[in-house]
Amino acid sequence: EWYELRKGMLTASSLACALGDDHFKSRDQLILEKVENKEIPFVPNPITEWGVKYEEIATKFYESLNNVKIIEFGLIPHPNFTIFGASPDGICSNDSPNEYVGRMLEIKCPPKRKFTKTCPPHYLMQVQGQLEVCDLDHCDFFQVKIEDYENFEEYEKDLFLDDDVILPGR
């Protein structure tokens, strides 16, 4: 159903592609998909599967860290331009502290990309589009690095030094 709603609609997550800044799809391919109303189904890859696997954990972590409740909305059409829409990862509910009410959340859980203090440009376009669709002013771009361990011993090796002291930042 989500894919059906997106057909023919430009979404915030497609803005970078529409502006020619996508590593996986050309602007021409996007235009062709939208004009023909035949969006090619997204084929998951290891990076997107990783993000989907850990997005709920990252949301819970954000909620705990900021003492908020996140509500998911699915695909939201722009109130004035129905051919444009967005699917933010969540918005802080009215049950959240005042400074967080209505704050949007966009989560990324990249398995390998190195984090910087700034939002990568292609994600910034997505966030700006989401804010416009939802008529909001603030978004937390929340990047989470989650380690996946094969076994408990591997986890312990990462957590402790040889003398059983917990490493800083763990």
State each model region's role.
Residues 1-53, 57, 148-150, 163-170:
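Charged, glycine-rich intrinsically disordered N-terminal tails and low-complexity linkers that flank
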Residues 11, 48, 59, 82, ...:
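Residue-identity detector for threonine
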Residues 55-59, 124-127:
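Short, well-ordered alpha-helical scaffold segments within catalytic/effector domains
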Residues 62:
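Active-site region of the double-stranded beta-helix
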Residues 65-88, 92-170:
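Nucleic-acid nuclease catalytic cores
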